[in-house]
C-alpha cells in the first residue's frame, strides 16, 4: 500500500507539538514496513467507506481514505478531535 497525503494533512501536521511530529514520523516508518503492526491499531472507522485510522500515540490519531493501492492521509490530530471527525464522517 502506498502512503500519500492531502494538503489538509500537512496543515494539521504543522500545528502539532514537536514530540508528536516525531511520533508521527516513527508511526509512518512503521506503517511503511507493516500497516498492520499491532501498535498502529490500523483499522477501518467507517462502515461503508474505506476510511481508516492509525494510532500515533495514546492521544493522537491520523485518518486516511484508501483509493486503489493508495491510502491518502487527510487528517492528524488529538483524539478528542478525532472523535468529532469520526462522528461527522459517519453521518455521510
Summary of predicted features, one role per range:
Residues 22-30, 84, 91-92:
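Short, charge- and proline-biased low-complexity linear segments
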Amino acid at each position: 500500500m502506498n502512503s500519500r497525503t492531502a494538503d489538509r494533512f500537512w496543515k494539521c501536521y504543522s500545528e502539532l507539538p514537536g514530540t508528536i511530529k516525531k511520533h508521527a514520523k516513527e508511526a509512518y516508518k512503521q506503517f511503511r514496513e507493516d500497516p498492520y503492526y499491532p501498535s498502529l491499531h490500523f483499522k477501518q472507522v467507517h462502515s461503508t467507506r474505506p476510511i481508516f485510522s492509525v494510532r500515533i500515540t495514546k492521544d493522537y490519531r491520523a485518518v486516511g481514505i484508501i483509493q486503489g493501492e493508495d491510502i491518502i492521509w487527510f487528517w492528524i490530530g488529538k483524539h478528542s478531535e478525532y472523535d468529532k471527525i469520526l462522528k461527522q464522517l459517519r453521518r455521510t
